[in-house]
Amino acid sequence: MGFIFSTEKVVYVLLLIFVCLENFGSNAQLLPEDEVQTLRTIFRKLQNQTVNIERTSCSDQNWNFVVESASNSPTSNITCDCTFNASSVCRVTNIQLKSFSLPGIFPPEFGNLTRLREIDLSRNFLNGTIPTTLSQIPLEILSVIGNRLSGPFPPQLGDITTLTDVNLETNLFTGPLPRNLGNLRSLKELLLSANNFTGQIPESLSNLKNLTEFRIDGNSLSGKIPDFIGNWTLLERLDLQGTSMEGPIPPSISNLTNLTELRITDLRGQAAFSFPDLRNLMKMKRLVLRNCLIRGPIPEYIGSMSELKTLDLSSNMLTGVIPDTFRNLDAFNFMFLNNNSLTGPVPQFIINSKENLDLSDNNFTQPPTLSCNQLDVNLISSYPSVTDNSVQWCLREGLPCPEDAKQSSLFINCGGSRLKIGKDTYTDDLNSRGQSTFSSVSERWGYSSSGVWLGKEDAGYLATDRFNLINGSTPEYYKTARLSPQSLKYYGLCLRRGSYKLQLHFAEIMFSNDQTFNSLGRRIFDIYVQGNLLERDFNIAERAGGVGKPFIRQIDGVQVNGSTLEIHLQWTGKGTNVIPTRGVYGPLISAITITPNFKVDTGKPLSNGAVAGIVIAACAVFGLLVLVILRLTGYLGGKEVDENEELRGLDLQTGSFTLKQIKRATNNFDPENKIGEGGFGPVYKGVLADGMTIAVKQLSSKSKQGNREFVTEIGMISALQHPNLVKLYGCCIEGKELLLVYEYLENNSLARALFGTEKQRLHLDWSTRNKICIGIAKGLAYLHEESRLKIVHRDIKATNVLLDLSLNAKISDFGLAKLNDDENTHISTRIAGTIGYMAPEYAMRGYLTDKADVYSFGVVCLEIVSGKSNTNYRPKEEFVYLLDWAYVLQEQGSLLELVDPDLGTSFSKKEAMRMLNIALLCTNPSPTLRPPMSSVVSMLEGKIKVQPPLVKREADPSGSAAMRFKALELLSQDSESQVSTYARNREQDISSSSMDGPWVDSSFSEPGKDVSLQQQEEGRSSSSSRKLLDDLTDVKIE
């Protein structure tokens, strides 16, 4: 019995062990072996060594952890679903591996995890692209923000209809968005910012009616903001910053009643737009419509957005007063209305606010009595008057010096402590404020900072070298910097007038120099100096050749005409804003150096030696002048009979060249070096033995303009010395060769720069156009008023303005210039000029004064702003010239529509309006009402206000002005039909032969033959228009 009992006991124990083992196996919840191998391959390709993959990993959770040591902490979180096969088999459903800086590729083996719903590989260092195998799995969430993934948008993602969240931000993806994205009808979040996507937003995205968040900041998109965004009625956040898209904001945006955050910035367009209708968007918390070409008043209903925390309407064309309803915005923390044209008083509730408000650069008519260093309200340059001394200096336009301007140099250690570098002491700049701040401790300089950090409102405005990038040999000021989320301006104050050398010191110290996600940031911003664009899309690390390396952007010849030098750094929505952390983007600068290009008067008297030197030099110059006069008048050596000898005898303050030199320079007048055909003959490009490039004008033996006229021209030009006139280097007179040697201007003519073929055009930015316009004006002012001889050019047009290597304007072709005597202003026998540029009184009556040049300048000024030719551009059939269209736009209050669309929004609206109004003032039909060129220069430089126009087309009830214009139009048409056939052919010949050089002929009249005479000889069909002109000669336009 004992044995039997023992046997039964053993069997019972064995059965019990078997049941226990079976139960244990069923509760183990193991991963299938094939999934284990897939996961091991994935982790190996990701180069992640922190996780061991076993079949039991879903149970022991050894792969789930967070490192709490830093911001953006490395996070590993892998989730399993163990409900398969009676809860005995597990499948991986979610994989999060964030902030590990994993350096591998995106493994295609992810597509073998058949139950995977989420992949989050944010903030790593992955390269390559997203694998096509993902279309095999029921993926719902994909996030790869902050990597190095590249290539086109993965088209396979459009086939994964289960996707609800896609985040590809801060990578290197390129190309257009695929149309099949519209298949993702379950999509709730589509985040694509900080890539290089191009093209338009596909219309198929109108199907994404479940979207709650769409962000595509900083991509180079094209086309207009699509109207179909109104279909996204569940949308809560829309970000379209810095996309290069065109306005206006579509009316359908009013359908997005669930929006809480709307950010649209830096729109392009040919005209300003009305404020979009947002009256239904009452859930708004953050509203940013910066630099969107919005005009008109701020709507009252904005004050009814009770949850509004941030409002940014800066850099638009807003007018009117700040709505009184804004006093109801109890929730707001930040308001930016700077750089508009707001008027009226600043409301007291604004001044009393304890929040951050930027109202700088406006036109408020009743300035408040505030400190220049007001903590919470920035009102710098918000009052248009410059001279009203009852207003604080910092509130006035241009920040005029409150005392005599005595400063001539400035050194600032931006964001750092006081430093001495060599002989220069850099002042400290340690104010930590920056949301809406103006700070000026010493009234020698100041800064104005504006903006709030995206996603991290408490981020700082001073930067330090957190990654220890700056080595010991680099100047100390590169270890610190000031930065701003939107706009950062530095002002050099109380500077003496004159030319300065400006050095802007940069070093990128907020991104790392290693193979981690901390190195993947891209900081991009624009730089303006004195209101002129200096750098677009400036990237410090790219220009310096890496992070932690210094880069100096030097600008020589910065002109201070008042007493302030302004440096403006502006973020335009491009680059990254989440690397290494949120709040790291926007303009950054390390130091500023300003030194004079002029000798600073120390007040010390001249030494006796210096006085003696000046006296001796003055006597020598006087003696030479007497000899020149005696020689020219024949009292010294007598006048020569031979004309060539007479030319040799001229002392023209120029150099003398031998024919051998000229032949060698031009390769014996090789046709390959011919760059144009002037009124006196061909023009050749040449290179002298010392390497200097010249332009040689050769007097043609066939020219009907004799050597005597050549003498007149060379004598006149040699006496004219001005930076904005083509310079005469010298001449050559040997045998029958009569040659003029001019400076060679590398960038050809203004006409070619503006109207040439795509290959020829220079795509001039706004600051260059403004500089060119001022240069032409200064050159003409010199000819009319400053030179010893009063000279009228008679043929100012874009082809007669040449551009040097630095794109400075120089007036050319004085072959048509005429010495003008006040007693003889009516020239009845010869009209020299170009149709479309000639003043009416000159074209119709032959009446010539310097005001004819003023008229022509006005036309050229319009062309510079618009980028369109006055004679070739016809927006509508009823408008003959660009000028006619400009008059209409002026009456409609839409002059800014004339601005060249190629400029986008990258121009100064204030300067553009100033230039356009000056152009129309210069083209006044009455010559007596046109300003002198010296006044035009002052108006262009902002020294005096632009005079209001005295002639308006609508103020002409009798229609006489329209009749006169019609008569001029008929005459122009007659002239073109009869005269310009020869002229056009000739001009085509010249332009075709002058593409390599700046020299082009400016005259449409046949050499030796007047336009008026040609018309009489070649046809009589103009009689009707002439009779009409005769009937109107006494009509007075008022």
From Swiss-Prot:
It is found in: Membrane. Its EC number is 2.7.11.1. It holds the Pfam family PK_Tyr_Ser-Thr. The chain crosses the membrane at residues 610-630. The modification Phosphothreonine is found at T658, T829, T834. The keyword Membrane applies. Residues 669-950 form the Protein kinase domain. Belongs to the protein kinase superfamily. Ser/Thr protein kinase family. This is Probable LRR receptor-like serine/threonine-protein kinase At1g53430. It comes from Arabidopsis thaliana.
